[in-house]
Curated annotation (Swiss-Prot):
Pfam families with a match to the protein in the record: Aldo_ket_red
Quaternary structure and interacting proteins, as annotated: Monomer.
UniProt function note: Reduces aromatic alpha-keto amides, aliphatic and aromatic alpha-keto esters, but not beta-keto esters.
Native organism: Saccharomyces cerevisiae (strain ATCC 204508 / S288c)
Phosphoserine: residues carrying this PTM: S123
Leading EC class: oxidoreductase
Name this protein carries in UniProt: NADPH-dependent alpha-keto amide reductase
Length: 312
């Protein structure tokens, strides 16, 4: 079988692999970064992924505390740096570094690389009181990293429409990406965010795109959504996860996923060996919206939008 890879084009003209197959958060997240918490398993998964064909998209973040593992894997691979797309995030809510610039300098040192391909503000919750700079000032810091070449692209994560509007008022460089929770059961993390990003040429990245399968029970098999995904899985001879991930990309969204199983990592990197029709994409969208909203993260803050957001 021939290998197919697809890319999204960002608003600055740069290309980004259309799926991130190694997310180093979620299952790999840890509360401290020590020799005792070092995960050889994560290193093995990254090294395995880096042996696959194509440009490999790895998603990291300050808050995950997995820089040592990413750095170790990068030191072991024979894949050239320009065949690796590395995303990192400054996490203001945990105050591990003084600013985006400080955070990135620490990250680059720990990962043993001179630059990241994408650097994100992990949340909009930046304040003078906690971080010593406002959201707008944090974005200006991000722009300097972009201009210096330490970050080839810059963006945000978990931003609502009003947060992006604040950034856009002062931006010399528009965010290239907004990484949010997105799945068939949560098609707007906050009201109107998917449409707003599309209208402003900001690529949406989806974390937890497979939430519906993660939380699926035996009783769910008879629900219309899962019945239809199974039908498509049998039609295309693909896993149900591949069907959902392909739906995500057909919505113009970049899925961020990961697995400890080599076959699933390979399946994700080979996602573009098949396609869904427009009708199939629309039906998954409709059946997903009919299902009760499923939010895995930020429930305290954004849970109030669960039903209203899906109607936008």
């Amino acid at each position: 079988m021939s290998f197919h890879q697809q890319f999204f084009t960002l608003n600055n003209g740069n290309k980004i692999p259309a799926i991130a197959i190694i997310g180093t958060g979620t299952r790999w997240y840890k509360n401290e970064e020590t020799d005792a918490t070092f995960s050889n398993s994560l290193v093995e998964q990254i090294v395995y992924a880096l042996k696959l064909p194509g440009i490999i998209h790895i998603d990291a973040a300050e808050i995950y505390r997995t820089y040592p593992e990413v750095g170790k894997a990068l030191s072991l691979t024979e894949k050239p740096r320009n065949a690796i797309f590395l995303t990192d995030k400054y996490s203001p809510q945990i105050k591990m570094s003084d600013s985006p610039a400080d955070g990135l300098d620490l990250a680059l040192k720990k990962m043993g690389t001179d630059y990241v391909d994408l650097y994100l503000l992990h949340s909009p919750f930046v304040s003078k009181e906690v971080n010593g700079l406002s959201l707008e000032e944090a974005w200006k810091d991000m722009e300097q990293l972009y201009k210096s070449g330490k970050a080839k692209n810059i963006g945000v994560s978990n931003f609502a429409v009003e947060d992006l509007q604040r950034i856009l008022k002062v931006a010399e460089v528009k965010p290239q990406v907004n990484q949010i929770e997105f799945s068939p059961f949560l098609q707007n993390q906050t009201p109107g965010i998917y449409k707003f990003c599309q209208e402003h040429d900001i690529l949406v990245e989806a974390y937890s795109p497979l939430g519906p399968l993660q939380k699926k029970t035996a009783q769910d098999d008879s629900q219309p959504f899962f019945e239809y995904v199974k039908e498509l899985s049998e039609k295309y001879i693909k896993s149900e996860a591949q069907i959902i991930l392909r739906w995500v990309t057909k919505r113009g969204v970049l899925p961020v996923t990961t697995s400890s199983k080599p076959q699933r990592i390979s399946d994700a990197q080979n996602l573009f060996s098949f396609d869904l029709t427009a009708e199939e994409v629309d039906k998954i969208t409709e059946l997903g919206l009919e299902h009760e909203p499923l939010r895995l993260y930020w429930n305290k803050l954004y849970g109030k939008y669960n039903y209203a957001a899906q109607k936008v």
